[in-house]
């Protein structure tokens, strides 16, 4: 028989239900908790119990408490070597010493499994869930109504934690998507900046080339203008001298006739 998993929730001794169960794996599978709802016909695997002849129509309080316990805290079952074992939650009332022992076991397991005292800790959550289930078991044995009310509180807490976990996972996924988008946008911007810097260098090179061409053209035109001005000045001087010579010749021709 596989030893039952160590839990703060108190269970009865495991009971062999069937020896002809189909072998599902080479080795015994881990403990599995199965939800079983009590029905009027007592459906579902139940450990063999000694049945006494009914002497009254009033339901047996012990049996009713066991059914409520099995509904609140379902039995766990497992298979080993084609044998089906089942283990129900204990219906034995707890004493004050049992509660003190439960507290000591909780503190010991928290220390042994190195649970964190603050923050999110799956180990601490698991142990406190087991402790809460054990408290529900103890309360249910004494008062089924209080046990059912605590069950509603437990289920509400689990639902709230599951909602927060879903919200956290969604937030993490959203943050990852945004981070990837930002990283992609950063890569695009870096690539665009590189392209613009390359384009800027090309434009600066073209500007420098155009400036050099402009300076060369201005220098060439300045030299050409100086040459043209010099040529024009020489022509003017030549024409002035020619004019003076012609004027002198004309005056020399006209003067003897007077």
Curated annotation (Swiss-Prot):
GO molecular function: dynein heavy chain binding
Pfam families to which the protein is assigned, alphabetical: Ax_dynein_light (PF10211)
Region entry Disordered, spans: 1-60, 202-231
Superkingdom of the source species: Eukaryota
Subcellular location: Cell projection, Cilium; Cell projection, Cilium, Flagellum; Dynein axonemal particle; Cytoplasm
Any coiled-coil regions, as ranges: 176-255
Chief location category: other
InterPro entries: Axonemal_dynein_light_chain
One cellular component term from this protein's GO annotations in UniProt: sperm flagellum
GO biological process, one term: sperm flagellum assembly
Disulfide linkage: none
Entry keyword set: Cell projection, Cilium, Coiled coil, Cytoplasm, Dynein, Flagellum, Motor protein
Task performed by this protein: Involved in sperm flagellum assembly.
Entry's family note: Belongs to the inner dynein arm light chain family.
Complex and partners: Interacts with CFAP45. Interacts with DYNC1H1.
Protein name: Axonemal dynein light intermediate polypeptide 1
Gene this protein is translated from: Dnali1
């Amino acid at each position: 028989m596989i030893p039952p998993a160590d839990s703060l929730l108190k269970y009865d001794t495991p009971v062999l239900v069937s020896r002809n169960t189909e072998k599902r794996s080479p080795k015994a599978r881990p403990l599995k908790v199965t939800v079983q709802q009590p029905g009027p016909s007592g459906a579902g695997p139940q450990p063999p119990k000694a049945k006494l002849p009914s002497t009254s129509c009033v339901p047996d309080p012990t049996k009713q408490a066991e059914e409520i316990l099995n509904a609140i805290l379902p039995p766990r079952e497992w298979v080993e070597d084609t044998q089906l074992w089942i283990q129900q939650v204990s219906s034995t009332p707890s004493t004050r010493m049992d509660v003190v022992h439960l507290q000591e076991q909780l503190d010991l397991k928290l220390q042994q499994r190195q649970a964190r005292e603050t923050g999110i800790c799956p180990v601490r959550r698991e142990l406190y869930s087991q402790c809460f289930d054990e408290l529900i078991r103890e309360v249910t044995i004494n008062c089924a109504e209080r046990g059912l009310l605590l069950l509603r509180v437990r289920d509400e807490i689990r639902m709230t934690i599951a909602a927060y976990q879903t919200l956290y996972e969604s937030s993490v996924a959203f943050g990852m998507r945004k981070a990837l988008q930002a990283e992609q946008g950063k890569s695009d911007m870096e690539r665009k900046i590189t392209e613009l810097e390359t384009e800027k260098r090309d434009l600066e090179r073209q500007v420098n080339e155009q400036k050099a061409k402009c300076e060369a053209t201005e220098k060439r035109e300045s030299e050409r203008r100086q040459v043209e001005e010099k040529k024009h000045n020489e022509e003017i001087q030549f024409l002035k001298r020619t004019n003076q010579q012609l004027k002198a010749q004309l005056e020399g021709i006209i003067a003897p006739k007077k």
